[in-house]
């Protein structure tokens, strides 16, 4: 049993669940097609559809990585556990880098990075994943 990987996986799965439900209710449903631009793929409704699909693809990515971390820390053993743990730690790092990087790029102050839990949760998940994988 690898406690850091289990914690990282549990955190990622919890985050995926929150991303799915809160994102659907608080973000996607509130997008008004009338306020969205058209794209070369179609009108505002198609833009909303693409945002909706991308949102839930991201949720599935979080769930997949979380499941891999959880399995690596609990059920899998040896080289298989290490390899999958390293891959999932790398993916977790990518998620954290995007959240922190884009958050910092658009932040008006360092404090605004703390308004949304994603940068901190994704960074904690990545740190736990690397701790457990190495």
Language-model segments: which ranges?
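Core segments of alpha-helical transmembrane spans in multipass integral membrane proteins
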Residues: 10, 22, 26, 30-74, ...
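N-terminal signal-anchor transmembrane alpha helix
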Residues: 2-25
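Hydrophobic alpha-helical membrane segments
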Residues: 85-100, 119-125
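Alpha-helical membrane-embedding segments
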Residues: 62-72, 114-126
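Membrane-water interface of alpha-helical transmembrane segments
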Residues: 2-9, 45-55, 78, 82-89, ...
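Juxtamembrane helix-break-helix junctions at the cytosolic face
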Residues: 66-85, 103-107
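Polytopic alpha-helical membrane-helix bundles and their juxtamembrane interface segments
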Residues: 3, 29-33, 72, 123-131
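Membrane-helix boundary connector in multi-pass membrane proteins
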Residues: 97-115, 129-134
